[in-house]
Amino acid sequence: MESAGTGRSLRTPPPRLLLLLLLQVAGPAGALAETLLNAPKAMGTSSSPLSPASVVAPGTTAFEESRLPVFTLDYPHVQIPFEITLWILLASLAKIGFHLYHKLPTIVPESCLLIMVGLLLGGIIFGVDEKSPPAMKTDVFFLYLLPPIVLDAGYFMPTRPFFENLGTIFWYAVVGTLWNSIGIGVSLFGICQIEAFGLSDITLLQNLLFGSLISAVDPVAVLAVFENIHVNEQLYILVFGESLLNDAVTVVLYNLFKSFCQMKTIETIDVFAGIANFFVVGIGGVLIGIFLGFIAAFTTRFTHNIRVIEPLFVFLYSYLSYITAEMFHLSGIMAITACAMTMNKYVEENVSQKSYTTIKYFMKMLSSVSETLIFIFMGVSTVGKNHEWNWAFVCFTLAFCLIWRALGVFVLTRVINWFRTIPLTFKDQFIIAYGGLRGAICFALVFLLPAAVFPRKKLFITAAIVVIFFTVFILGITIRPLVEFLDVKRSNKKQQAVSEEIHCRFFDHVKTGIEDVCGHWGHNFWRDKFKKFDDKYLRKLLIRENQPKSSIVSLYKKLEIKHAIEMAETGMISTVPSFASLNDCREEKIRKLTPGEMDEIREILSRNLYQIRQRTLSYNRHNLTADTSERQAKEILIRRRHSLRESIRKDNSLNRERRASTSTSRYLSLPKNTKLPEKLQKRKNISNADGDSSDSEADAGTTVLNLQPRARRFLPEPFSKKASQAYKMEWKNEVDAGSGQGQPSPPAAPRSKEGGTQTPAVLRQPLLSKDQGREDSLTEGGRPKPPPRLVRRASEPGNRKSRLGSDKP
């Protein structure tokens, strides 16, 4: 036989050429065909001609004879998404289980319970010698779990208290973090110099690095604890704002000291570069966040025709700001916070109400799941072999964290109180110092330490875990009874009324004017300047014009315009002194409304007057608001009954000689036995069947309000006497249908020309005293009569003249 190579290829050209052409026609498989055909040449070995069955398409394996399996298991194919789904499901079920027993979350914070669940799972994983899931890496924490929590906190942060206390928050976050980092680091370095403790190999820079990461007040732990105790808004915004900005400062100091530890020699230029980097990282993150927030607002200006993607822009631009800042080694926390606060101001006015609800609840869901996973992963990662115990280092670390935190708060507050209008009390300072909870930030940072540079990394991990567990468990559990014992001012859950908001804005303008007159540039002055700049430039650029108004506002506007035109026609709007002769007073006529106009008015009122108002309540972090339709319906029912009682009471106390300018009667409700149009009658029957109406039919039939415009005070005396006799008071006693005793029933009301009934022009009211009514209520047979019912009738235009004429002596 000839050797493999040219001779063999010349011997059998037709099948190979046909196969090559066939595979090349098939597309990308041509390259694979050439590789398979040239493989024997490259190896220099003899081989038999390739059969079509031996050529394998890309992405498949060689043909093997096998049978079709009935059941297969391929866990590695879905391992990562399957485990992530199970972790999220476990975290959600754990939260449901905690809240089944209502007293448990009030005694023990939810974060403590989740850490305990994580410790239990970590012990199980460690016992079966399994590795931790891939989701527990520190990169996953900083890139996927932390951004939703910071986004939720920044988007729904109360902006006015934050900016009013911005100086104090920055004072605590920047100066306080430097105070704690340097104080803890230097103190631990002094402890390490004692040879008896065996810590002499830890340098000053390593202690400063550990002090910077252990001084990070975690916003996740602070939110989990302080939202349950409901402290006042100022105290909450100080602690939360400090924890939010404190993390950004901590990360900058951490990277700075970490770079110094990796350098062999540190020069003076490196120190100044580190200080400059401190400001560049913070300010750069804020600028990136504001810029992308403006872009998000400008984008949502053009989404009125496609509302579905509006919530998507909020999450995309906010997360883009975070990862962009991290890409340039800037502060991602500052970037996403600034972006969220900017979007909350402008994006909310461009998106629809449904999109806003979607944003709110989806953001709440993401933050809640991320927070739950963080605490569970902290418990799981605690159990392992990466620990080194040293009593001196661990105990002194915990003591120095508490001491330097308390000293920093009291010293810095004493300085900042000189510049505050409302100084912080001793109780507030104590709660701020007590609320310095450590959490996932320092836990993740200590795991990021390179083991080659830090040989005592396991000791740092152990000390950080002890500090985290002490602050979360001991301080977190005892802070609620401590707040109650000190009687710290709590938050007011009452929603601000419209009048209160108007008065607050009025006082803001007054204080701004006073500051302008005095030449003092306070926060009121700068807020007013920014508002003018915002109205003049930013809102015109970022907010869509011709914002749609709600139906109730449009209806109210139409009714007000119609009422103003009517008042102008009747002359009631004139309040300036008149120089016309008082004797020359003529009765003004009002154009009667056509039946079609009356039907239209009644239809508008019946459709829109008593609709339940839909309100968006204030944001609560983890608890969904209950359905308020029943409560709003009860509120409307109470207000309607109260207004009806007040109107009857006021009309009873009116002067009998009230003047009337016209004889036209306008009814708020229809007179008794008046037939409705078919459209309104069907709607009324449907509403009564559904139970929407809260007033009984009997009351609606007997209670008729006569709405007549008030006349001028200079009407002639004869006309006022004539109008004052339009009402009379008398009894109307109603007895049971079965008894034939009692007073005779009143005569039937005469029919009008239109076919409806006219109510008599008599106002029936009880005139007897309480004792006399009790005596008359007994009949001859001893059966008590039913109490008289108050019936109020209004006069009809057709019967007024005849009744007034019959009453004359």
UniProtKB/Swiss-Prot annotation:
It catalyses: Na(+)(in) + H(+)(out) = Na(+)(out) + H(+)(in). It is a multi-pass membrane protein. It is found in: Apical cell membrane. Pfam families: Na_H_Exchanger, NEXCaM_BD. Keywords: Antiport, Cell membrane, Glycoprotein, Ion transport, Membrane, Sodium, Sodium transport, Transmembrane, Transmembrane helix, Transport. The keyword Membrane applies. Gene3D superfamilies: 6.10.140.1330, 6.10.250.1040, 6.10.250.2020. Its main location: membrane. GO terms for cellular component: apical plasma membrane; brush border membrane. The chain crosses the membrane at residues 107-127, 138-158, 169-189, 209-229, 237-257, 278-298, 308-328, 361-381, 392-412, 430-450, 459-479. It comes from the Eukaryota. High levels in intestine and kidney. Strongly expressed in gastric epithelial cells, with particularly high expression levels in mucous cells. Glycans are attached at residue 350. GO terms for molecular function: potassium:proton antiporter activity; sodium:proton antiporter activity. Residues 648-700, 734-809 are annotated as: Disordered. Residues 648-660, 793-809 have a biased composition (Basic and acidic residues). One of its GO terms (biological process) is sodium ion import across plasma membrane. Belongs to the monovalent cation:proton antiporter 1 (CPA1) transporter (TC 2.A.36) family. Plasma membrane Na(+)/H(+) antiporter. Mediates the electroneutral exchange of intracellular H(+) ions for extracellular Na(+). Major apical Na(+)/H(+) exchanger in the base of the colonic crypt. Controls in the colonic crypt intracellular pH (pHi) to direct colonic epithelial cell differentiation into the absorptive enterocyte lineage at the expense of the secretory lineage. Interacts with CHP1 and CHP2. This is Sodium/hydrogen exchanger 2. The lineage of its organism: Eukaryota, Metazoa, Chordata, Craniata, Vertebrata.
